C-alpha cells in the first residue's frame, strides 16, 4: 500500500505533467482563464488519464509487448498508433457523456474537449506507463495521480489569473506574458518537491 501512495504523490507533485514535464500546455494556458472551466477540463483530463493509462496498459501487456500474443512476435512498433486510438475512443465517449448530461460544461470547453485526444499530457502519461513498465494496479494509480496533478496545476493557475485581473500588471506582460511568468514560478514551487524521496 505504501508503494501506491508513494506513486500517487510522485505523480501529483514531483512528476506533475504540467509543471515538471510541461505537457499539455496548449490547453493548460488557453482554458485557465476561469476556475470553473479549468476545473471542468481538469476533471475531463483526470477521467481520460485515469481510464486510458490502465486501458493502454492492458493493450500493451496483452497484445503489443514482445511475446504477448505469440512467442517471438514483437508488436511494440504499434505502440503510438494503438495508444492514440484508445485515447481517441475514450475521449469520444467522454465527449458524448458531457454533451448529454453536462451541456454547459461541454459548451464552455468548446474545441478543447476534442483536443484532449491529442493532448500530450494524456499521451505522456500512457508513454511513461509503458516506459516504466507499470503493472495494471500501478497504472491505475499513476493515471489518476497524473490527472489529479494536472487538474491541480490548471486550477491553481486559473485562480491566480482570476486574481491578476485586478492587479496592476505592466503593459508588456499583460495576457500570456504574465501567465508564462506565473507558470514558471509555479513550476519552481513544484520543483521543491523533487528532493522528496518516496
Curated annotation (Swiss-Prot):
Primary location recorded for the protein, binned into one broad class: membrane
Catalytic reaction equation(s): a ubiquinone + n Na(+)(in) + NADH + H(+) = a ubiquinol + n Na(+)(out) + NAD(+)
Enzyme class (EC, first level): translocase
Membrane topology designation: Multi-pass membrane protein
Xref: InterPro entries: NqrDE/RnfAE, NqrDE/RnfAE_oxidrdctase, NqrE
Signal peptide bounds: none
Cellular compartment(s): Cell inner membrane
PANTHER family, A to Z: INTEGRAL MEMBRANE PROTEIN OF SOXR-REDUCING COMPLEX, NA(+)-TRANSLOCATING NADH-QUINONE REDUCTASE SUBUNIT E
Subunit text: Composed of six subunits; NqrA, NqrB, NqrC, NqrD, NqrE and NqrF.
Described function: NQR complex catalyzes the reduction of ubiquinone-1 to ubiquinol by two successive reactions, coupled with the transport of Na(+) ions from the cytoplasm to the periplasm. NqrA to NqrE are probably involved in the second step, the conversion of ubisemiquinone to ubiquinol.
Family, similarity comment: Belongs to the NqrDE/RnfAE family.
Protein name (database record): Na(+)-translocating NADH-quinone reductase subunit E
Gene: nqrE
Amino acid at each position: 500500500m505504501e508503494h501506491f501512495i508513494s506513486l500517487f504523490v510522485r505523480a501529483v507533485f514531483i512528476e506533475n505533467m504540467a509543471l515538471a514535464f510541461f505537457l499539455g500546455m496548449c490547453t493548460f494556458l488557453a482554458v485557465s482563464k476561469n476556475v470553473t472551466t479549468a476545473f471542468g477540463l481538469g476533471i475531463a483530463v483526470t477521467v481520460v488519464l485515469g481510464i486510458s493509462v490502465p486501458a493502454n496498459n492492458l493493450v500493451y501487456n496483452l497484445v503489443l509487448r514482445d511475446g504477448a500474443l505469440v512467442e517471438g512476435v514483437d508488436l511494440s512498433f504499434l505502440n503510438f498508433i494503438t495508444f492514440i486510438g484508445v485515447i481517441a475512443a475514450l475521449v469520444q465517449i467522454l465527449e458524448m457523456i458531457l454533451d448529454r448530461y453536462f451541456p454547459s460544461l461541454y459548451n464552455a470547453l468548446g474545441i478543447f474537449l476534442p483536443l484532449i485526444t491529442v493532448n500530450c499530457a494524456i499521451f505522456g502519461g500512457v508513454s511513461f506507463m509503458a516506459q516504466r513498465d507499470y503493472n495494471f494496479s500501478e497504472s491505475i494509480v499513476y493515471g489518476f495521480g497524473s490527472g489529479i496533478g494536472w487538474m491541480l496545476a490548471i486550477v491553481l493557475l486559473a485562480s491566480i489569473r482570476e486574481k491578476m485581473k485586478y492587479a496592476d500588471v505592466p503593459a508588456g506582460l499583460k495576457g500570456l506574458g504574465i501567465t508564462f511568468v506565473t507558470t514558471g514560478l509555479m513550476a519552481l514551487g513544484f520543483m521543491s518537491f523533487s528532493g522528496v524521496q518516496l
